Every structure is written in C-alpha cells, then in structure tokens.
Amino acid sequence: MTLSFAHFTYLFTILLGLTNIALASDPETILVTITKTNDANGVVTTTVSPALVSTSTIVQAGTTTLYTTWCPLTVSTSSAAEISPSISYATTLSRFSTLTLSTEVCSHEACPSSSTLPTTTLSVTSKFTSYICPTCHTTAISSLSEVGTTTVVSSSAIEPSSASIISPVTSTLSSTTSSNPTTTSLSSTSTSPSSTSTSPSSTSTSSSSTSTSSSSTSTSSSSTSTSPSSTSTSSSLTSTSSSSTSTSQSSTSTSSSSTSTSPSSTSTSSSSTSTSPSSKSTSASSTSTSSYSTSTSPSLTSSSPTLASTSPSSTSISSTFTDSTSSLGSSIASSSTSVSLYSPSTPVYSVPSTSSNVATPSMTSSTVETTVSSQSSSEYITKSSISTTIPSFSMSTYFTTVSGVTTMYTTWCPYSSESETSTLTSMHETVTTDATVCTHESCMPSQTTSLITSSIKMSTKNVATSVSTSTVESSYACSTCAETSHSYSSVQTASSSSVTQQTTSTKSWVSSMTTSDEDFNKHATGKYHVTSSGTSTISTSVSEATSTSSIDSESQEQSSHLLSTSVLSSSSLSATLSSDSTILLFSSVSSLSVEQSPVTTLQISSTSEILQPTSSTAIATISASTSSLSATSISTPSTSVESTIESSSLTPTVSSIFLSSSSAPSSLQTSVTTTEVSTTSISIQYQTSSMVTISQYMGSGSQTRLPLGKLVFAIMAVACNVIFS
C-alpha cells in the first residue's frame, strides 16, 4: 500500500509531538535584559531568564493542537523611582495562547483537489484589570487585547521554510481618582500591532500574515488618534510611521503606513500619540527571527487642554514634550523551531513551533507643556505630567482535558501589593508684562512709566491616595525702583475631612544712591583730583507666613488656628569705594527664621559686599518628616555666586541643589539632583510539564528525558498501522 498524503501528514504530526518532548528535555537558555532610563521614573530593568520551552500536542480528528508555554520562567524586574505614598493594587491578569495545526485543501489551480496542506494557527488572548481597595477611592486600570490570528499555508516546494510570528497587543489605561470635592479622570489608549513573517526560500511559497489592531482613540479636548491595521506578507518588511497634523486648537493625528520589500524579517511597531495642538510620538521597534523575537511596543496618549487666547489675531501656540513618552512593555516570542521530514519522493514541509508571549510590568510617564502667547505679552503655560506604574504579578499554569482535547491556561495571579502610584500634575502659569506707572512712593511723584511684570502660577498635584495639593503663586516686579512682591498659597487635601492651607507673602524694595568722595589734597600743580567714589545700597525685605486650617466634613465644624507667624525685616547698608589701595567698608546682615508646623521651613538669607571678588556661602541643613528648605547667598557685583537649595515633599526623599556662578569673563552653572530611591524586585517562577498524545498506542504523561526505546516502538507501531490499513 502506498503512503498517501493524509498518511504522511499523520506521521508528520506524530513526529512533531515526539520532537516537542525532546525540546522539553533539552532546554534552551535565553537571557533578555531591557533597561530604560527616564528622568521622571529613574531606571527600570527587566530581566527574563531562563527560557525553557514546554509544549503539549493534542491529536484529534486529523487536527493537531500544540500548546506552548515557558518552563520554568523567571521574570525579575527592578526599578529605581521616587518614593511615593503607598497604595495597594488588586491585579488580575489572564493570558491564553494556542497553536493549532490542521490541514486544508490547496486552492491553487495547478494542484489536484486531493492536495491537503498543513495549516498553523496562533491565537492569543489577554485580559488585565487592576483596581484599588474601594476605601481608598476607586482607581481602575484595565487592558483587553483582541484576538490575533496568523495563518500560514505552505505549498509543495523543495526545502521551503516558513515561520510566522504575530504579537497583537492592545492596551487601554484608564485611571479615575475620586476625591472630594474634585474628580480627576485619565485615560490613555495604546495600540501596538506587530507582525513578522519570514520565508527564506523563494520557491513557490504562498504565505499570508495578517495582524489586526483596533483603532486607538484618545479624547481629551478634541484630540483623536487612529492607528490603522498593519499587514505583513512573505519576505517583506512592514513599518508604520506616525505623523501628526495640527489644526487650530483641536488636532487629529493619523498614522500612515509604508511597505517595502526586503528579504529581512524585521517589523517595526509604531505608536501614534496625539496631543492638542501638537504631538510627538515615540515608537519602539520589534525584531523577529525564526529563533527569537522581542517586541517592545509602548504607547501613551495624552493631550493638553484647549486654551483660548485673549488676542486671536496675534496668537502663537506651541506644544512640546518636555519629557518624552516612555513605557516599558516586553512581549517575548522565543524558540521558534522548525521540524522537517525529508523523503526523496515526497514534498518537504516545515512547521514552526512558537512559544507564547510573556508580559512584564510596564511603567509609563509623560509630560506635556503647552504655551500660548498673545499681543498683551501674556503667556499661558500648561504642564500635564502623568506617571503610572502597573504593579507586579505572579503566574500559574494548568491544563484541562475535555472530550480528549487538552487546553492549557496560563493565569497571572494572584495580585501583589506594592507601593505604586498614579500621579497627575498640572500647572497653569500666566506672565503679564505691561508698561504702566508703579505705585511705589519713589515712582509715583515722577510718574515714571516702568515695566511691571506680574506672574500667577497655579499647580495641582493629585496622588492616587487622594492627597491633593493645590498651590497659587503670584509675583510683582518693577523695573525702576526694583520693588518686588511675592505671594505663595498652598492648599493640601489629605482626605475628604482634612484641609491644610498655608500662605506666604514677601515684599521687598531697594533704594540706591550714589555719592562721590573727593580728596582736596593739592598736587604740585595745584589741581584737585578725585581719589575715590562709591555706591551705597539699602534693601529691606519683609516676609510673612500665616494660615493653617482644618475642616471636618463629617461634623461640618471648622477649627482654624494660626500655627506660626514670622516677620523678617533685614536691612543692610553696604558701600564700595574704589581707590588705589584701601578697603573701606564691609557689612553683612543675616536673618534666620525657623517655623515649626506641619511643614517645617528654614530660611537663611545673607547679603555681603567687599571690594575684592570673593564668594559668600550660606549652608543650611534640616532633617524632619516634612521639610522645606531655602537658602540664598549673594556677593559682589563683579563676581556673583548664587546658591539655591530647595527640598519639599511628603517625605524627605528628593533634594535638588542648584549652583550658579557668574563673572564678567565666564559663567558656570552646575545642577545636582539627588533622589532617594526604593528598589523593588519581583521574581516569578513556575514549572509545568508537557503532555503529548500519540494515537492509541502511547498514553499521555510527563517526560524529562527522551525515551528513545518507547518512541521508536511507537513510530513503528503507528507506521505499520498506517501502511497496512
């Protein structure tokens, strides 16, 4: 009896299952390390190691289903980021992948109707939800990806090799933080299609690979981003590049795709990010070969509000990403193996075996800055900063057999509680410069027209723990009399029943006069000459800090008490006289104020002037649970050194040091930022066994080594059954 095509396919399927056992007993170690550095979130490192392929093959009614997983798997993620208030996430992530082998009739006109072709189908589904305990005000993050199917049909040829890998991932990030009296909603949609198809041999191979991705839409003040589908065919490279089109104050960004023919097998996944009125997108590439694939496809869509201008006829709008969108997501499809059966009188077939994708925690951050300028010299700056860290997870895998069909389920559970945050920060700044008469007593008599610069800065920081901080800063400066005033007000809502408010006002002005000191000693010629001249400067500074209140929303009672009030008045008289050899005056006045309150403040100011260029240093150190630190030092006009140290946070974790030194010939600026970090390490490991069902001659079980004797016997038994049936 001759060996028919159906018999050959049956034998090939059995050999494929036996090879899967060999794969499970012969691990292949793959080490993947991804390091991403971001200014806002520090360094995030993800390591996946080792990668051992474990497969299960089910043969039923002529259809072979191959279930693939990683066995064992260790995912280690370490991140260095700013310490933030702790909150607990409840996370559920389920993932399921199958690879089905079946046969179908070839539709080519040159092939007879009895020609059947082995068909490979890969299906991946995933669902991810995350929520916070309802007592902490609900925040939900969910991700649901569509089912992607790749079908590869290989016709008869001489040693063709065909491999297809698809990684469709569509993630939706939505964050809703509810805290009385405000509710903040944040949503971002990411679509990252990745499709790679390789066919090294160009002899009569018909392959098709289609990747479908849902459109990505983010609506925030009329901003829409749509990502079309990406299609990759055999021996081709498909890359998707995004472009942005800005129209007035609502923009639409559309991704355009370009296709080029190339024997290489590289697919670039592009994400489109739309912001109003301008956008910048960051895309990550995905490289796939027949043995290894890594796909990183981050996307975060954020848009800034639409702002109205006071002077539409002369309005310039610009939007820039001060901190480009970054996200770390890893999808790994590894150890694609080809099994070939060769016989001189029969065609050659090659079917790939591809492991399932592995998802890792992702970290996203984005900062958008929008500037609107009009004729009145007013400038509006809006900054939106979004930083979200998805918590860690653990993984479990189990099998279910129903009616002879075994299905493998990979579940990412249970959730883990980590110190994760979801922070939304926005700032609105208005700067106005007008030519008007200053109201200070030195300017009013002369009715001198001066340039008055006014600034109002409003910012709101909302953390997922319902701690909301709103600040308002206003300043006023006159170019003639150097009168300046500064007001700072901060309102912090720790919960729905507690409100803390602090207001600080500072006003200063400078009066200067120039005197001439003449020496009337006669020279031999009888003439007089000036020996020295000097300038004296008087400065007065007044600072006031007041107002802290607590409101109990349950009893509707308000208790307000003044924690601290300090008035700082410092005046300094300094004069510099220039002569041949004398230093006449050195004066320095320092003031120190320490306030003990929920926010501890230390202020040090120092003013000094001497003849020779020197540097004056002010050093301040404070250690408290909540701290705010400010130090300022000023020295001579010819060589100025300015030092500012600021630290303000819920916990003493972030310190910023800014040093500026300038002189006539050169200038030097040094910026040092020190961030206390917390390091988290997540280790996930699980072990599964592969199951192989080979007809009725060999049972199912788990194998750690290749039983050659039993396999040879099974092949002989099945071959005899096929040949003589």
From Swiss-Prot:
Entry membrane topology: Lipid-anchor; GPI-anchor
GO MF terms held by the record: cell adhesion molecule binding
Pro-peptide region(s): 700-725
Sequence-type repeats, residues: 53-149, 182-188, 189-195, 196-202, 203-209, 210-216, 217-223, 224-230, 231-237, 238-244, 245-251, 252-258, 259-265, 266-272, 273-279, 280-286, 287-293, 294-300, 301-307, 395-493
Record keywords: Cell adhesion, Cell wall, Disulfide bond, Glycoprotein, GPI-anchor, Lipoprotein, Membrane, Pheromone response, Repeat, Secreted, Signal
Subcellular localization: Secreted, Cell wall; Membrane
Endpoints of the signal sequence: 1-24
Lipidation (GPI-anchor amidated glycine): G699
GO CC list: cell periphery; extracellular region; fungal-type cell wall; side of membrane
Record region (2 X approximate repeats): 53-493
Region of interest called Disordered, as start-end residue ranges on this chain: 168-318, 335-363
Alphabetical GO biological process terms: agglutination involved in conjugation with cellular fusion
Region feature 18 X approximate tandem repeats, Ser/Thr-rich, mapped onto this chain: 182-307
Subunit structure: Heterodimer; disulfide-linked.
Function description: Cell wall anchoring subunit of the a-agglutinin heterodimer. S.cerevisiae a and alpha cells express the complementary cell surface glycoproteins a-agglutinin and alpha-agglutinin, respectively, which interact with one another to promote cellular aggregation during mating.
Comment text on domains: The number of the intragenic tandem repeats varies between different S.cerevisiae strains.
Protein name in the entry: A-agglutinin anchorage subunit
